[in-house]
Amino acid sequence: CGGVDAPCDKDRPDCCSYAECLKPAGYGWWHGTYYCYRKKE
C-alpha cells in the first residue's frame, strides 16, 4: 500500500489503512497528482 506522501490515484486509491488519498494543498496540485496523507483521527 502507499504510505504517507506516496502518490495515489483518486479513482483507485491504494493508500495504507492509516492514510487517505487527498489533493495536496499547495505543491503538486497543478499536475493533478494526489498524495496519501495521514488520517486526522
From Swiss-Prot:
Tissue: Expressed by the venom gland.
Disulfide bonds: C1-C16, C8-C21, C15-C36
InterPro entries xrefs: Toxin_22
Subcellular location: Secreted
Lineage: superkingdom: Eukaryota
GO cellular component terms attached to this protein's record: extracellular region
Any GO molecular function: toxin activity
Keyword terms: Disulfide bond, Knottin, Neurotoxin, Secreted, Toxin
A matching Pfam family: Toxin_22
The keyword Disulfide bond is annotated on this UniProt entry: yes
Its job: Toxin that causes irreversible contractile paralysis in adult Aedes aegypti resulting in 100% mortality after 24 hours.
Family named by the database record: Belongs to the neurotoxin 14 (magi-1) family. 08 (Ltx-4) subfamily.
Domain notes per entry: The presence of a 'disulfide through disulfide knot' structurally defines this protein as a knottin.
Name of the featured protein: U-theraphotoxin-Lk1a
Organism: Lasiodora klugi
Species classification: Eukaryota, Metazoa, Ecdysozoa, Arthropoda, Chelicerata
